[in-house]
């Protein structure tokens, strides 16, 4: 099974979903992380404020921070390879990385615009 490592910028808590001004992208990603875990996916998250040594000890992450700064986070590594930086992925992107069919995601084409109909 593939492993996704997420290196988050410094946040007040492990998910960033706290306080009064919550970033919707973090809410969505936190929900998607839970969904992936239910699908049996291995995910590890590291918060720069809470686990700075994890950033220093990983050579790829260390090099990324030296080149892009903490402003370039989040950094996502899939089996040790960079798959995304600077934003959190959408559920469809996560599904593609892990080979989860889109119908399991609720994003499969449906209705009259899917298939060979001309009703749209």
UniProtKB/Swiss-Prot annotation:
Keyword entries, A-Z: Arsenical resistance, DNA-binding, Plasmid, Repressor, Transcription, Transcription regulation
InterPro entries: Arsenical-R_ArsD (IPR010712)
GO terms of molecular function: DNA binding
Pfam families assigned: ArsD
Domain of life the protein comes from: Bacteria
Key word Transcription regulation present: yes
Biological processes, Gene Ontology terms: negative regulation of DNA-templated transcription; response to arsenic-containing substance
Biological role stated in the UniProt entry: Inducer-independent trans-acting repressor of the ars operon.
Name the record gives this protein: Arsenical resistance operon trans-acting repressor ArsD
Organism: Escherichia coli
